[in-house]
Amino acid sequence: MDLKKKIREVPDFPREGINYKDISTLLLDGEAYRQAVQELARQCRYKAADLIVCPKLRGLVIGAPLSYILGTGLAVLQRPVRLPGDALSWQGMALGEDSFYLSREAVKPEMKVLVADELLATGGTAFTAIKMIEELGGEVVGTVFLIELTGLGGRAKLNDYDTISLVQYNF
């Protein structure tokens, strides 16, 4: 199945000249969604991750099923108001976010961690997750994305980490 055909492109959104990649059409097709997640899991299985870290909302649609299939734990980067207890924060997020927070209990020293998200563009979100994981003593064993917008520098920003993406768009 050509997964790219299952992703709707919305022209001139959020602004003129941008073609938004809408994964909701892929998510609505159960077989396409299952195939995408199973293929990502197949490519990630050898990494022997203990934990998947993903950003809240869109990252969860990839991170949660991957965690289930791979039998790992799941930790979610989120806003502080939603996270009780001691949390690590990181400033300077991409996409206009001021910061993300990760529970300090989520990542243990030497834990093998896979970062998952639905989209790789500039790499800012994934890079932030990586820095937080490493500060907590975890070992990032790779990054995984459903979609990659090539040409925005995301893969280069993550050059020190094995990066997997299923669908690529020239951007």
UniProtKB/Swiss-Prot annotation:
It catalyses: AMP + diphosphate = 5-phospho-alpha-D-ribose 1-diphosphate + adenine. GO terms for cellular component: cytoplasm. Its EC number is 2.4.2.7. It is an enzyme of class 2 (transferase). Pathway: Purine metabolism; AMP biosynthesis via salvage pathway; AMP from adenine: step 1/1. It is found in: Cytoplasm. One of its GO terms (biological process) is purine ribonucleoside salvage. Keywords: Cytoplasm, Glycosyltransferase, Purine salvage, Transferase. Gene3D superfamilies: 3.40.50.2020. GO terms for molecular function: adenine binding; adenine phosphoribosyltransferase activity; AMP binding. HAMAP family: Aden_phosphoribosyltr. PANTHER family: ADENINE PHOSPHORIBOSYLTRANSFERASE. Catalyzes a salvage reaction resulting in the formation of AMP, that is energically less costly than de novo synthesis. Belongs to the purine/pyrimidine phosphoribosyltransferase family. Homodimer. This is Adenine phosphoribosyltransferase. It comes from Pelotomaculum thermopropionicum (strain DSM 13744 / JCM 10971 / SI). The gene is apt.
